[in-house]
Each structure stands twice: as C-alpha cells, then as structure tokens.
Amino acid sequence: MYLILQDNDVSRYIVEAVEEDNPEVTVIYQPAMIRMEQENLMVVKRETVEEKLGRDWDVQELHLNLISLGGNVDEDEDRLELSWVL
C-alpha cells in the first residue's frame, strides 16, 4: 500500500514519524509530493507525529496534506492504519 503527501513542512514531519514507526517503509521524494510505500501494513501514529511536530496533532489533519492513498483504511483518534489483505 502507499500514502502520498504534498511536499511541505508539515508533511516532512509526518514522513519522519512514519519512518520511525514503520522501519521498512520506502520513501520516494518526487516533485511537489512524497510517496511512502510499505507491504502489508503502514501506521501513522498521532503520538509520534506530535513528537515530531512539537504540538498537538489530530489524525484528521493528515487529510490536509494527503494527495492519495492505497490500501484498506482503519482510522481512529490515535492512528491511521493502511493494510493490504489478500
């Protein structure tokens, strides 16, 4: 599955958090966007993003920077999880 964000300051902190919580993630920097790919499961954790940003962060804020995503989405107030079940 994949997650594509606009390439901006907030997204860069989100990418750092995703890399910390998902060590196997592949990050691809492209013009104006950042694509993250991972097999099976990718998690964006509120707590980790808050640590990187240095402020409170609502998982719904991810949608402000989101270009596209692929996979099954499970979202609550603490995390957004993308998975791929065959």
What is the meaning of each model-derived region?
Residues 7-21:
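Short amphipathic alpha-helix segments
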Residues 1-4:
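Short glycine-/aliphatic-rich beta-strand segments at the starts of folded cytosolic domains
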Residues 6-11, 52-56:
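N-terminal start-of-chain detector that recognizes signal peptides
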